[in-house]
Design a protein with these regions (language model features):
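A surface-exposed partner-binding patch
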Residues: 1-106, 112
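Compact, glycine/acidic-enriched structural inserts
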Residues: 106-146
Length: 150
């Protein structure tokens, strides 16, 4: 049995334990092996696809968001760079997408109708995608993912 690493433990310190969890089938883990970072697949195996902070942040099944990601990227240059998969989302429709070729990620902000990406970075192969996944979770901020009353 694997244990949580310090990066995911730090994420949980900020967001709390999952408030909802779907166990990830081994077939899904196998389907994304070699496509998404091994560390993310290990988080799926340990934690499932889950909601944190009462649904403020979710780890998700990329297949559930593939059509939405495709619609958002249609007509942009991003599909020419890589094939992207949604790995997480917020309660308010911000999607975090991961590229399978270069192992770089960016944000699709549905509520503000923008894609936030460092284009030059997207063309560079990430030498340590597992470290990037750990950093993604460790650096996550519940405050930054919440929307204030307007």
């Amino acid at each position: 049995m694997s244990v949580r690493d310090e990066d995911f433990a730090y994420f949980l310190k900020k967001f709390g334990e999952a408030t909802y969890t779907d166990k990830v089938p081994e077939s899904s883990i196998q389907k994304f092996k070699g496509i998404l970072p091994d560390q993310l697949l290990e988080y799926w195996r340990l934690e499932g696809w889950s909601a944190y902070a009462n649904g403020l942040m979710w780890t998700v099944n990329p297949e559930d968001y593939s059509d939405l990601v495709q619609q958002w990227l249609e007509g942009t240059h991003y599909p020419k760079i890589d094939k992207y998969h949604c790995i997480a989302r917020t309660a308010f429709g911000v999607l975090y997408v991961w590229g399978e070729k270069y192992n770089q990620w960016f944000t699709i902000s549905c509520p503000t109708n923008v894609i936030v990406a460092f284009d030059k970075k997207l063309f560079n192969v990430n030498p340590d995608p597992d470290h990037s996944i750990k950093s993604f979770f460790a650096s996550a901020s519940a405050k930054a993912r919440d929307l204030k009353d307007l």
